[in-house]
Each structure stands twice: as C-alpha cells, then as structure tokens.
C-alpha cells in the first residue's frame, strides 16, 4: 500500500505504523479523517466473522483516534469510511448499525451509499463499495450531495499492458503450468478477459473487469486472465 501511495502523493507525509500504536499526537491537524479497515471479515470472499475477527475490530481504533483528537480539541469535522458493500447487510445489518451508532455517539450525522467504481471513477472494473460519511455539522450534512454517475469511456483495451513487458514472469501461464491445455484452448481472443471457474473457462464479454480482490494474488479460481500480445 505504501509503495503505491508514496509515488502518487509525493508531498504527503505518510506514517507507516500499526494503527493500534498510532496516537493522536502523531496526527497533524486535519478536517477530514478518512479510514479504511480490512474488508475480509465482512466480505463474501472471506468468512464474514465481522467484529469477531481481529481485523474487523480495527474500526474501533478509528473511534479511539476520534476520541483522542477530541481531547486535544482537534476533532475532525468529517469522517470518511469505505468498505465492501456486504458490510451493510452483515449480521442482518447489525454491524453497520453498530458502526453508525458509535459515530453518532461521537456527534456525527451519517450518510451512506454503495457506489461502483465503473460508474463514478471511469475505471473499467466492477467494484462496489459502501461509503460512510459523518459530518459534525448537520447543516453541512444536509447540503451534501453524492457525485453524479459519469459515462464509462475507459475500456479494458486501453488500460492493460498487453505487451507484457515489465511484468514479473510469475504472473504468466506457460506450457508447464497446471490447466495450461484447458486455458490455451478456451482463451482464443486477445484483448478479452477470462475467468477460470475450477472446471471451465468463461469469457467476460462486458468489457469490464470483475472485482479484483486481495487474495487473487495467491492464484486460485475466479482470477481474471488475459491472453497478451505474446
């Protein structure tokens, strides 16, 4: 995460630290506290243990920071949180309501919405996420408007490095790879996305990549595959 963030935000001070150990005094003056926490405890792809998972409990570290900043008279005016859409319905909605209640107890007025990257970011990937925003000032909350959808103009065709140059060879299948014969036979079209579904290969004809997840780096089924120019 840090390796990606730093080149894109070279002027931003990045504190790489265990959130459990970060104290308010390490945080500069801020108007907006943007927080994310591991989605696996709430995700369909995970075991959905929610707050019973240590990673799910990291939400309460955000609450702790808010409390410490408030004690220092630097309480953020806005709280901005993001997670998988399934968090909204996790445990019959109790997880979301618990988080909403915790934020409201800190004085925040809450709005929430599920947005898809391909409809708002002009990125050809289906990535639905739940966004939760809390405002200290209720008047600001009432004036807030979610962004309008934008037309998707970027396509898989123009965002993927089809040459394969500069990409680690470990991400490529070859004749010695397991399931090579099946993949080679099924993946006939270049510049298209395929998914290996354990026993068959499906071509994704929507032109939009399915959600990329953290565990895809470990291989397995459902990982998007392409046939590059080589």
Name each region found by the language model:
Residues 217-219:
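Short, charged/polar surface micro-motifs in flexible loops or helix N-caps
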Residues 38:
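Short glycine-/small-residue-rich Rossmann-like dinucleotide-binding loops
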Residues 13-15, 74-75, 221:
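Secondary-structure boundary/capping residues
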Residues 1-8, 146, 176, 188, ...:
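Short intrinsically disordered, low-complexity coil segments enriched in acidic
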Residues 16, 34, 80-81:
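Generic enzyme active-site microenvironment
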Residues 222-230:
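Short, surface-exposed loop/helix-turn segments at secondary-structure junctions
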Residues 1-21:
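SAM cofactor-binding core of SAM-dependent methyltransferases
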Residues 22-30, 42-211, 215:
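Class I S-adenosyl-L-methionine
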């Amino acid at each position: 995460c840090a390796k990606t963030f730093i080149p894109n935000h070279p002027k931003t001070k990045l504190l790489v630290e265990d959130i459990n150990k970060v104290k308010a005094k390490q945080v500069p003056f801020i108007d907006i506290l943007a927080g994310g926490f591991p989605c696996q405890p709430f995700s369909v792809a995970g075991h959905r243990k929610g707050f019973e998972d240590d990673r799910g409990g990291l939400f309460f570290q955000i609450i702790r920071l808010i409390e410490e900043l408030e004690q220092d008279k630097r309480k953020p005016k806005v709280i901005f949180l993001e997670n998988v859409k399934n968090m909204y319905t996790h445990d019959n909605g109790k997880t979301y309501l618990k988080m909403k209640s915790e934020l409201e107890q800190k004085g925040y007025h809450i709005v929430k919405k599920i947005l898809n990257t391909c409809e708002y970011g002009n990125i050809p990937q289906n990535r639905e996420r739940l966004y939760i925003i809390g405002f200290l000032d209720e008047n600001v909350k009432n004036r807030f408007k979610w962004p309008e959808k934008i037309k998707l103009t970027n396509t898989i065709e123009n965002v993927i490095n089809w040459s394969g140059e500069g990409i680690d060879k470990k991400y490529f299948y070859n004749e010695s790879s397991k399931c090579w014969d099946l993949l080679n036979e099924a993946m006939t079209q270049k510049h298209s996305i395929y998914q290996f579904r354990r026993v068959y290969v499906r071509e994704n004809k929507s032109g939009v990549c399915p959600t990329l997840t953290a565990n895809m780096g470990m291989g397995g089924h459902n990982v998007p595959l392409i046939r590059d120019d080589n």
